[in-house]
Amino acid sequence: MTYKDYTGLDRTELLSKVRHMMSDKRFNHVLGVERAAIELAERYGYDKEKAGLAALLHDYAKELSDDEFLRLIDKYQPDPDLKKWGNNIWHGLVGIYKIQEDLAIKDQDILAAIAKHTVGSAQMSTLDKIVYVADYIEHNRDFPGVEEARELAKVDLNKAVAYETARTVAFLASKAQPIYPKTIETYNAYIPYLD
C-alpha cells in the first residue's frame, strides 16, 4: 500500500499539508523521523509505507494552539485529567483527532502509533515502537545518549524503547516535572529489557 491508499493523497500532496501545519525546524524533524521509521521498518520486517506515514504524521498537531487542543479534548475525549497536561502529551494522544478531521485517516494501527509516540504504552505494537523510537533517534537529534539509543535500535527494538523511556523519565525527574502515568507504565513494562 502507498500513502495515498491510507489518505487519498500522494506523498507530495501529503507533504504540503504536513508542511503547512508546522515550522521549518519541526518539518525537518518530521522528515528525519519518517526516514528513521522506514529504516527501522526494513530492519524489523514491518510495512515501510505504514511506518513512514505514521512517522510523517506523528507531529502533525504539535503546533496547534491550546484552545484547539481543548476543543478536541471536549469533542472527542472528555477527560478533565487530560486537560492539565499540555502540548507535550496532547499532540500525540489528542492530535490524532485533528489528523482524522483533516486527513480522514482511519487506520487504527497508524492512529495508535501516533497517539503513543509521546507517552508509550505497556503494550506496544511493532509500529508503535518504530514511531516511538524513530522520534527519539532521527538524524537531526543531538543530545547525550542519542548514539547509544541509535545503536540499541539496530539490535533490539524493545531495548531501544526501554532505554528511551528510562532516559525520558530520568530527565523529567531531574527537572522535577510531572510524569504522565502511561509513561510510567511504559517504563515498568520495558525496563526489564535492559537487564
Swiss-Prot record:
Domain HD residue range list: 26-140
Catalytic activity: P(1),P(4)-bis(5'-adenosyl) tetraphosphate + H2O = 2 ADP + 2 H(+)
Disulfide bonds: none
Tree of life domain: Bacteria
Enzyme Commission no: 3.6.1.41
InterPro entries for this protein: Diverse_Catalytic_Enzymes, HD/PDEase_dom, HD_domain, YqeK
Binding site for ADP: 29, 59-62, 91, 117-118, 135, 141, 178-183
Entry-linked PROSITE patterns: HD (PS51831)
Gene3D superfamilies noted in UniProt: Hypothetical protein af1432
Keyword tags: Hydrolase, Iron, Metal-binding, Nucleotide-binding
Residues annotated for Fe cation binding in this entry: H29, H58, D59, D135
One MF annotation (Gene Ontology) recorded for this entry: hydrolase activity
Stated family: Belongs to the Ap4A hydrolase YqeK family.
NCBIfam families: bis(5'-nucleosyl)-tetraphosphatase (symmetrical) YqeK
Subunit structure, as described in the record: Homodimer.
Function per UniProt: Hydrolyzes diadenosine 5',5'''-P1,P4-tetraphosphate (Ap4A) to yield ADP.
Name of protein: Bis(5'-nucleosyl)-tetraphosphatase, symmetrical
Protein's organism: Streptococcus agalactiae serotype V (strain ATCC BAA-611 / 2603 V/R)
